[in-house]
Amino acid sequence: MNIIEGAITAPHANVAIIVSRFNSFINDSLLSGALDALQRQGLVKESNITVVRCPGAYELPLLAQQLAKKGSYDAIIALGSVIRGGTPHFEYVAGECNKGLAQIALEHQIPVAFGVLTVDSIEQAIERAGTKMGNKGAEAALSALEMINVLAEIEP
């Protein structure tokens, strides 16, 4: 049996992080977690990390597409938070963001890590941005690094 697994270290990787400004009090914690994981666990050099900000989670797929088209990055990490309110807006934004990012990963054959919180309350967002439930930004960063290495193992 042949088992292919990817390491989480990728010292020569070029990584783009796209982060939404809306709900920045949450997203800045996700970004800090992602940067920490990339540098401390992934051994990625700070000079190999590009951070791009956008207005909200809905805009993340367009940024991811443009960065993927450049061909300069080994992975893209999308960070943001969509908090449910009293209108259907949550479903529209969360759904389109998710679908858009997944489509870009498939079309461009590049890891696009999904670090966008889709939660019912601010409390749930805070829990997932570095308190009780860990930091989903760090988890997305580690997922991106692992996928870089897994894809390198299976490419012809």
Swiss-Prot record:
Catalyzes the formation of 6,7-dimethyl-8-ribityllumazine by condensation of 5-amino-6-(D-ribitylamino)uracil with 3,4-dihydroxy-2-butanone 4-phosphate. This is the penultimate step in the biosynthesis of riboflavin. Pathway: Cofactor biosynthesis; riboflavin biosynthesis; riboflavin from 2-hydroxy-3-oxobutyl phosphate and 5-amino-6-(D-ribitylamino)uracil: step 1/2. Keywords: Riboflavin biosynthesis, Transferase. The gene is ribH. GO terms for molecular function: 6,7-dimethyl-8-ribityllumazine synthase activity. (2S)-2-hydroxy-3-oxobutyl phosphate binds at residues 86-87, 128. Belongs to the DMRL synthase family. 5-amino-6-(D-ribitylamino)uracil binds at residues 22, 57-59, 81-83, 114. It is an enzyme of class 2 (transferase). GO terms for biological process: riboflavin biosynthetic process. It catalyses: (2S)-2-hydroxy-3-oxobutyl phosphate + 5-amino-6-(D-ribitylamino)uracil = 6,7-dimethyl-8-(1-D-ribityl)lumazine + phosphate + 2 H2O + H(+). Its EC number is 2.5.1.78. The keyword Transferase applies. Signal peptide: none annotated. It comes from Photobacterium leiognathi. The active site is at 89 (proton donor). Forms an icosahedral capsid composed of 60 subunits, arranged as a dodecamer of pentamers. GO terms for cellular component: cytosol; riboflavin synthase complex. It comes from the Bacteria. This is 6,7-dimethyl-8-ribityllumazine synthase. The keyword Transferase applies.
